[in-house]
Amino acid sequence: MNENHVYDMIIVGGGPGGYTSALYAARAGLDTIVIEKLSAGGQMSLTWQIDNYPGFENGIDGFSLAEKMQKQAEKFGAKSEYAEVFNMDLTGKLKRVETSSGIYIGKTVVIATGANPRELGLAKEKELIGHGVAYCASCDGMFYKDKIVVVVGGGNSAVSDAALLSRIAKKVIIVHRRDTLRATKIYHDQLMKTENIEFRWNNTVNELIYGERLTGVRLKDTVTGEENIIECDGLFVSIGRKPTTDFLGNQIELDNKGYIVAGENTETSIPGVYAVGDVRTKLLRQIVTAVADGAMAVHMAEKYMDLTVAMSKPYLPC
């Protein structure tokens, strides 16, 4: 790797937003590299069946979709590097990205590091993803039509998931460790009126019951300590997400949950730096919205680079 080489665009994160940026940038003739810690796709690659991404009438698994996105971007000249980002200096005109494989310099940076769902931390939880354990009701809810599902959580995301699932599943059981929801009151009132939703207050999920897939959960009462088992077909964990932004330090504006503050134009508080996908502040976190962000970031980056070049030219009086 040549540390004196200056890329037009460095993309940190190889999810759908990152590789869409790579595709658009490479097709525009920009010297582009994607730096990904593990494998292409991010959280998407862990999804065993995606039915809500246009163009695949029979659905597609996340790993295959990620592979297609990566190959398409690389076909037009984008490069991929597998490395962990340790530090970034984004303040100058040239941005510096320090990784486990060396230092990369770029004129612009797209941050596409995503957000990971918070897990319960139970034995076999990871292994049962796609086999009864899920973290996204809008992604996986349709697989539980006329089934019994448990939703863990008490905030707005849990309530939203429960409301959506109540229109699909036979029964929805909300398990919350307190005796009241933290969600907005209007959502709370709506759920209370929904016939196929029931609540297990002051309870936590302490164990997953399974064979080849999830068959139930063991609950523990936080007041009495009593335990009991609920039979269910699915468990939706809705206890929040953690954006991957710790490596940024204090140099870029984050909201109180750690998400990068960026609007629909993907611009951050630092000129020439853009945030796409689940890592930025947004209302809807889906593959299609991440893809849209990726295209927008390249559009804004091109405008930024054109303006930077124009401002660097000497003024020649008439």
List where the protein language model places each region.
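A Rossmann-like FAD-binding core segment of flavoenzymes
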Residues: 5, 73-92, 96-98, 104, ...
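Beta1-alpha1 glycine-rich phosphate/pyrophosphate-binding loop at the start
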Residues: 7-76, 159-185, 255
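Glycine-rich, N-terminal phosphate-binding loop of Rossmann-like dinucleotide-binding domains
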Residues: 14, 113-114, 239-240
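Residue-level detector of alpha-helix initiation sites
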Residues: 15-16, 39, 115-117, 155-157, ...
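Glycine/small-residue-rich loop that forms an oxyanion/phosphate-binding "nest" at active or ligand-binding sites
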Residues: 80-142
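FAD-site-proximal beta/loop scaffold in flavoenzymes
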Residues: 121, 127-143, 239-289, 293-296, ...
